[in-house]
């Protein structure tokens, strides 16, 4: 059966349980393995704005949200620069034509950000779009609205200096949403007076109803209360867990009940009150990798036990060239750590933290997008829209460069699905494929 036929069959089976993602899909922010990697092969080795371009679809505005891909559909969150409205888009993966477009509320501006930053998620039948306004929409693949929720109305305002940016997680039949936010709702002039607590929430993806809500308590005070990281699953310690990172702690929660099983808080011993967290955890080799704020060290953890864990759970640390915003990549048994401001990539042995190699990627802009691992390569993109392709493995090598945009603030991570690359710039979504030919 063709990929298109498989997708149509999934739609026809709308009353059944969710279908499993194949290696050719990219269903949520960090991909099918939740670590930025995919088993995709046959991707184009060289490309540009005119070379190996299958299609290039203009977008109504910028966003840090990563496109998600299932079969012949691409789902994209955006903002319309002309109307300042938030949008949910469905694009045909074969042609680049817009299948449907839905308005999803009013945008709010935040410093260097907008409310379309969280990435959508899909299971092949439903696409869930979440926004920094805390509005969540579930659409079927035809674009019909199944349900919507206003989490600010139900669970309080998300007060973060740069606007809420955490992406939802679909895992084992639940949709997880995390709000690691400042307790003072009106701190940045965007919310009502009063205080509200951070939380981890599980909802029924079919109905949108809350299954449980777990308070995410912390003694952090100041901007350090805020985190832009996303929840990540972890199969460790004898069961399925959801990892939540920010507000001075990494916590592991029972995926079924939300109960906090353990927490570790060793990355901010001086209690610096502006150390907000942006990168999400990465899991690999039975370890959890977390990246401290503002280029402070990263840590590899073995979180065994319960309650408050001490630093005996730290397997190793690395602090020379580490990110502030981008999330690291676990790919083919290696850990790739971007220093997003210095534009340096380091390849580490994930078991020991020993550097295998390090390479300067160059370019004139910082990197905020997280790297992709696919087809034996590492794909990075800086804020100016320049893509840098590195060889994965034992030797550092830059394989290709491509200027894909003329505008700054390109922050969406590159994804691979169905033998193609999807690159979102400030103004366009590119679909790149081998032998697609030149584009005028």
PLM regions and their residue ranges:
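Bacterial N-terminal signal peptides
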Residues: 8-18
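Noncatalytic, solvent-exposed loop/strand surfaces
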Residues: 21-440
């Amino acid at each position: 059966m063709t990929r298109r036929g498989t997708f149509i069959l999934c739609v026809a089976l709308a009353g059944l349980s969710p279908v499993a993602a194949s290696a050719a899909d990219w269903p949520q922010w960090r991909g099918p393995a939740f670590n930025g990697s995919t088993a995709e092969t046959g991707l184009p080795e060289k490309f540009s704005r005119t070379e190996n371009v299958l299609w290039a679809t203009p977008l109504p505005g910028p966003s840090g949200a990563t496109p998600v891909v299932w079969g012949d559909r691409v789902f994209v969150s955006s903002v319309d620069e002309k109307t300042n409205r938030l949008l949910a888009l469905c694009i045909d993966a074969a042609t680049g034509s817009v299948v449907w477009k839905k308005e999803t509320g009013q945008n709010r501006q935040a410093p260097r950000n907008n409310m379309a930053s969280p990435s959508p998620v899909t299971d092949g039948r439903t696409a869930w779009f979440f926004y920094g306004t805390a509005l969540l929409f579930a659409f079927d693949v035809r674009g019909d609205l199944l349900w919507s929720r206003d989490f600010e109305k139900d669970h309080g305002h998300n007060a973060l200096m740069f606007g809420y940016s955490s992406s939802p997680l679909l895992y084992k039949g639940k949709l997880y949403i995390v709000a690691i936010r400042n307790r003072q709702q009106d701190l940045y002039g965007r919310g009502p007076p009063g205080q509200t607590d951070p939380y981890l929430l599980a909802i029924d993806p079919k109905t949108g109803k809350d299954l449980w809500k777990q308070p995410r308590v912390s003694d952090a005070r100041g901007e350090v209360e805020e985190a832009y990281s996303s929840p990540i699953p972890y199969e460790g310690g004898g069961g399925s867990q959801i990892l939540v990172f920010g507000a001075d702690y990494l916590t592991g929660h029972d995926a079924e009940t939300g109960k906090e099983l353990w927490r570790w808080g060793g990355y901010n011993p001086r209690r610096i009150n502006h150390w907000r967290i942006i990168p999400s955890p990465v899991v690999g080799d039975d370890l959890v990798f977390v990246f401290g704020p503002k280029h402070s060290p990263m840590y590899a953890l073995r979180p065994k036990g319960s309650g408050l864990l001490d630093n005996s759970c730290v397997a190793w640390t690395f602090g020379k060239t580490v990110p502030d915003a981008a999330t690291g990549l676990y790919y083919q048994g290696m850990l790739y750590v971007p220093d997003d401001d210095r534009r340096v990539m380091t390849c580490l042995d994930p078991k020991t933290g020993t550097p295998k190699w390090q390479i300067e990627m160059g370019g004139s802009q910082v990197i905020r997008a997280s790297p992709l691992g696919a087809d034996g390569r590492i794909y990075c993109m800086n804020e100016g829209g320049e893509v840098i392709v590195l060889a994965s493995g034992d030797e550092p090598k830059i394989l290709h460069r491509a200027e894909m945009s003329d505008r700054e603030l390109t922050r969406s991570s590159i994804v691979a699905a169905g033998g193609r690359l999807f690159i979102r710039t400030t103004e366009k979504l590119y679909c790149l494929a081998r032998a697609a030919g030149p584009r005028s």
